[in-house]
Amino acid sequence: MIAKECKPITREASIKPSIENVIPYNEYKKTQPRILGVPQVIQGTNDDDMIVLYGGGRDFILSLLDNEINSNKENGINSINVELFILNKCILMWFKDLGRGIEISYNSVIYHGSNRIQGEDSRDGHRYELVVTVERDLILNELFPVYGEEHSDALSKFSLRSVEFKLRPRYSTYDRYYNVEIETLFTFHNFGVNRGDEMVKNCNDAIALCLEMNENQFISSEEEDLDVETSAYDNEQNTMNQDSNSAVYTGINEVYNTYQNSGYGDDLDGNNMIMDNKFMKNGVEAGMSMEFYNNEAITGQKRPMS
């Protein structure tokens, strides 16, 4: 059985993450019991009711990377103020001006990293920006359309369509500013100095961690399906073998499903004369057939002759 490919789909988000509906990872470690033998960092991905926040930030400026398709233009959009939430289930970008957001599946993330800012905007504590490239779908095409000349249909059919997000912190690590509202989610206790280059590093590490967790789950589900299919195939083969050939061919008889044990099966008694000189009787060598049940190990001990 071949599993059908499940293509990730970006979804619209109408509820903004807050301290009431998500829990920071540091708080999660304190409040949730630890399961023996299971890394605590992975437990949050298995609970459908638990949404864990691993990273993010409030003041990001979103734009798109230049590429050949848009002819060195930013796809016709201006910079947008967004808030980034890196959750155990998805990456959520919240558009402040729209009061809406989008949930990006980790399976659609192609690559991520930090890009060094060039030019006069680069200064101490404000030298890097976060880059996240994701596979396009219907919602992303509608929100971030591609302008300019399109490739041929034959090439587009087999090409991976992607959109490259640039998330630049508004403030430097060393800037002093005051929030309009009291911060209850991205606190210093949970995320440290979450500004400027430190915020980029924290977000990049959080995405890498969540990608690894979701990849492990995807691999585990594939292995479970493969094990089930393999077990079913082995059982079927064993059943067929048992029905068609209930006895193992030992090489001393040309007829299946029968046993003919003749001669002397005493080659473990330590008598070198029998080992060196094959004792033949009626043209048949010594033989012995054994059958093991339930895969139980059979152990024995060689006893010297008295």
From Swiss-Prot:
Alphabetized UniProt keyword annotations: Cytoplasm, Nucleus
Top-level taxon in the UniProt lineage: Eukaryota
Segments crossing the lipid bilayer: none
Subcellular location as annotated: Cytoplasm; Nucleus
Keyword presence, Nucleotide-binding: no
Gene Ontology cellular-component annotations: cytoplasm; nucleus
Protein name per its UniProtKB record: Protein LOT5
Family: Belongs to the LOT5 family.
Organism of origin: Vanderwaltozyma polyspora (strain ATCC 22028 / DSM 70294 / BCRC 21397 / CBS 2163 / NBRC 10782 / NRRL Y-8283 / UCD 57-17)
Matches recorded under InterPro entries: ICln/Lot5/Saf5
